A protein has these predicted regions:
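N-terminal glycine-rich phosphate/pyrophosphate-binding loop and immediately adjacent elements
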Residues: 1-62, 170-171
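Conserved redox-cofactor binding core of oxidoreductases
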Residues: 45-166, 172
Length: 172
């Protein structure tokens, strides 16, 4: 994928890679784990999207995590996605964060509490030094189930439900 040409960038378009692989874009991204701003979720809810306020989605974020720091009101343990602090701290980044703080930009120790305005080290989806993508966290543990067939190079047209339970997909 590419962005549309933009006249403010001399009509350039920018490559925008997407994860057409098991695990989706979590298999190709920079490993950063960030949920987004609380106020953005609340605006989605205010626009009529029931179930999308910060307080509505927070329990699902907590359930998804296996947070290295431990569980609390914002983080969970025992979930399928391993979330940890970055192992490498770079002096140049520390200097940048100190400079940002000097001009009034706060340091942030946890970008996943709903207010991620500021500067700091992001957490990553990593386990034992390896990427913990959605495929690693969710698919690998169940990939040998007899009732699961993994298909690649397919396009899903529809998720089929019985009552409120997804039971299959229609694809080509």
């Amino acid at each position: 994928y590419k962005t549309e040409p933009d006249e403010t960038m001399e009509n350039r378009s920018i490559p925008y890679p997407r994860g057409k692989t098991l695990g989706g874009s979590s298999s190709i991204n920079g490993l950063l784990y960030i949920r987004g701003q609380e106020q953005d979720y609340d605006v989605w809810r205010q626009l009529g999207n029931k179930g999308w306020s910060w307080n509505d989605v927070l329990p699902y974020f907590i359930k998804a995590e296996n947070q290295e720091r431990g569980g609390d009101e914002f983080h969970g343990i025992g979930g399928p996605l391993s979330v940890s602090d970055q192992r490498i701290k770079l002096p140049i980044l520390d200097a940048f964060m100190n400079a940002a703080e000097e001009v009034g930009i706060p340091k942030v120790n946890d970008f996943n509490k709903g207010d991620n305005y500021g500067c700091g080290y992001f957490q990553v989806t990593e386990q034992n030094g390896l990427r913990c993508s959605a495929a690693v966290g969710y698919l690998n543990p169940i990939k040998n189930r007899k009732n699961l067939k993994i298909e690649t190079k397919c396009h899903v047209e529809k998720i089929n439900f019985e009552n409120k339970k997804a039971v299959s997909v229609s694809y080509w």
